[in-house]
């Protein structure tokens, strides 16, 4: 008899000790509540031991059965990547094992260049490819924001324009073969894009999302979907800030595509790229080979980091 539990996806689960695979992937995370899916497609509500919170959507984990609907997460398997943010007070895991970050932005409501820049740095630090999605591209307010994003195309970040209700399919070739995550401010259209890409899957996953979100109209948890056998997509809650306290100041220049080729070229090995003579970074900014605003951004992030 199929389970009536809202997190089970209506999948029948016989004796768990006889049928359960001991590995699974976290497909939803909400505080200390998780949904995991085993290789045969069965889903379970999951908890952790000792109130551990170091698990993320996308993690592949070892599990132990509790009953036909619930399991305990014992530990995570080695990660390919981990995307997270950290400020002076706390660390927030965003997603594990993703290979591509899509930063969804739009001219309305007010877009945050600060968030965009920081998310790109976090992706570089995690070894994750990054793509910028300019959503709501048909709005008249888009022209100015589009112009600002052209700079990031020169750095090698693709910028893809979408109108979520009309041409979300433009993203399919970009997503194909990747474990993707959509990230951005609230109101940028991440969930609308996700629903458009899911198509017929939307109704099937709606009960789980509604249960996790407690009836809210905005995404409050990370949720992983399979677009096909080779492609996954994580929809994540909206962000306003992206702390980078987990980064090391000495490594920062390597995360800037426009400055990494200058690493090691300054006269002094401990150059702060400010007033030192023979600074390759400062020279590049002064001659127009690099953006003075980007150098100021690098300096500002360096000042934020502890130590």
Swiss-Prot record:
GTP binds at residues 135-138, 184-192. Keywords: Cytoplasm, GTP-binding, Hydrolase, Metal-binding, Nucleotide-binding, Ribosome biogenesis, RNA-binding, rRNA-binding, Zinc. It holds the Pfam family RsgA_GTPase. GO terms for biological process: ribosomal small subunit biogenesis. Its main location: cytoplasm. Monomer. Associates with 30S ribosomal subunit, binds 16S rRNA. Belongs to the TRAFAC class YlqF/YawG GTPase family. RsgA subfamily. This is Small ribosomal subunit biogenesis GTPase RsgA. The lineage of its organism: Bacteria, Pseudomonadati, Pseudomonadota, Betaproteobacteria, Neisseriales. The gene is rsgA.
């Amino acid at each position: 008899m199929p389970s009536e539990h809202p997190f089970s996806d209506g999948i029948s689960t016989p004796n768990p000790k006889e049928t359960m695979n001991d590995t699974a992937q976290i497909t939803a995370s909400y505080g200390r509540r998780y949904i995991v899916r085993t290789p045969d497609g069965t889903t379970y509500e999951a908890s952790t031991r000792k109130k551990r919170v170091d698990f993320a959507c996308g993690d592949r984990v070892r599990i132990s059965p509790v009953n036909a609907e619930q399991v305990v997460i014992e530990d995570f398997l080695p990660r390919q990547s981990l995307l997270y943010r950290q400020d002076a007070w706390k660390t927030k895991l965003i997603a594990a094992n993703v290979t591509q970050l899509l930063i969804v932005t739009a001219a309305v409501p007010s877009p945050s260049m600060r968030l965009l820049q920081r998310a790109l740095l976090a992706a570089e630090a995690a070894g994750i490819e990054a793509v910028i999605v300019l959503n709501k591209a048909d709005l008249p307010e888009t022209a100015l924001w589009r112009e600002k994003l052209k700079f990031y195309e020169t750095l090698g970040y693709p910028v893809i324009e979408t109108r979520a209700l009309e041409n979300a399919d433009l993203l399919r070739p970009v997503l194909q073969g990747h474990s993707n995550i959509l990230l951005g401010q609230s109101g940028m259209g991440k969930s609308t894009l996700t629903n458009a890409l899911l198509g017929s899957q939307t109704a099937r996953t709606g009960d789980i999302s509604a249960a996790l979100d407690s009836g809210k109209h905005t995404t409050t948890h990370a949720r992983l979907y399979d677009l096909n056998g080779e492609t996954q997509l994580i929809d994540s809650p909206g962000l306003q800030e992206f702390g980078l306290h987990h980064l090391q100041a000495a490594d920062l220049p390597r995360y800037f595509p426009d400055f990494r080729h200058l690493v090691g070229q300054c006269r002094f090995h401990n150059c702060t790229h400010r007033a030192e003579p023979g600074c390759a970074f400062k020279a590049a900014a002064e001659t127009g080979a690099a953006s003075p605003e980007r150098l100021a951004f690098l300096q500002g992030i360096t000042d934020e980091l502890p130590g």
